[in-house]
Amino acid sequence: MIVSTLEHILTHISLSIVSILITIELRIFLDDEIKKLYDSSERGMLITFLCITGLLANNWIYLGHFPLSDLSESLIFLSWSFALIHSIGYFTKNLKFLSTITSQSTLFTQGFATSGILTKIQKSSILIPALKSEWLIMHVSLMILGYAALLCGSLLSVALMVITVRNDGKFFFKSNNFLFREISYQNKNFFYAINYYKTQLIKELDFWSYQVISLGFIFLTIGILSGAVWANEAWGSYWSWDPKETWAFITWIVFAIYLHTRININLQSTNSAIVASLGFIIIWICYFGVNLVGLGLHSYGSFPSTSN
């Protein structure tokens, strides 16, 4: 009873704080002068991170195993991963765009994980035999940490593409009229300042997208390898082309291509951002879409069947 009440309190506190922080983050993103508001937002996100950490610890004690055995539990861990990335970014300057992404990602995943949609698959304290292994924590946690980092990096790439497309647009209407030419001349410095700011923002988005995706790719690679070892112990085969395994491999290939485009100077920035944006969709198919189908060896984490 106490454990259940504590879980309820921690869940709603974390969800409420993040909901408030989203409004603050969006306001801060548009105004560089709100220092106190920014500090309050960061402290609030740290509190959210601690609440979700407490929620995971509470569930671990209640269930008797680390809470990563179904979709609901993995979503909570995913929201914790977003909050962790946000907390790391707190100690790095000029990362407000990353904070905006991670705070909203935390809200959506935490909100969905604790919603009534997943009620039927929550609180299953009995593990299937394949999950009763020390590999559970290592494999699943690394995969979800990898997904979280790759999703954040991909969203930075999406933002980069949007800004790049708008930056390439024409700010002036071509006209031979003297009045329009005069206005264009007077506002030239203003538009140069805007373009300079956008150029610097694009460079920062490109740099941090690459850094975050590289980190996520490392987690994903180790997660897949550890999963292969675990699969051999549990099912007698390192790889069985299970739907989840197949899409995890596709995800790995997509982001391997992304890293290749980063090595090739001619394919950097916009081209690599396109690949990362595609990867954003692929990750959700791998993580969430396969669970909707509920087929294969990983179907224990899927939605429950509605038919009896």
Swiss-Prot record:
A Pfam family reported for this protein in Swiss-Prot or TrEMBL: Cytochrom_C_asm
Family of this protein: Belongs to the CcmF/CycK/Ccl1/NrfE/CcsA family.
Transmembrane segments: 2-22, 44-64, 71-91, 143-163, 212-232, 247-267, 273-293
Membrane topology of the entry: Multi-pass membrane protein
Principal location: plastid
Single GO BP term: cytochrome complex assembly
One example GO MF annotation: heme binding
InterPro entries, sorted: Cyt_c_assembly (IPR002541), Cyt_c_biogenesis_CcsA (IPR017562), Cyt_c_biogenesis_CcsA/CcmC (IPR045062)
Gene name for this UniProt entry: ccsA
Described function: Required during biogenesis of c-type cytochromes (cytochrome c6 and cytochrome f) at the step of heme attachment.
Name of the protein described by the UniProt record: Cytochrome c biogenesis protein CcsA
Keywords noted in UniProt: Cytochrome c-type biogenesis, Membrane, Plastid, Transmembrane, Transmembrane helix
Subunit structure: May interact with Ccs1.
Subcellular location per the Swiss-Prot or TrEMBL entry: Plastid membrane
Cellular component aspect of the GO annotation: plasma membrane; plastid membrane; thylakoid membrane
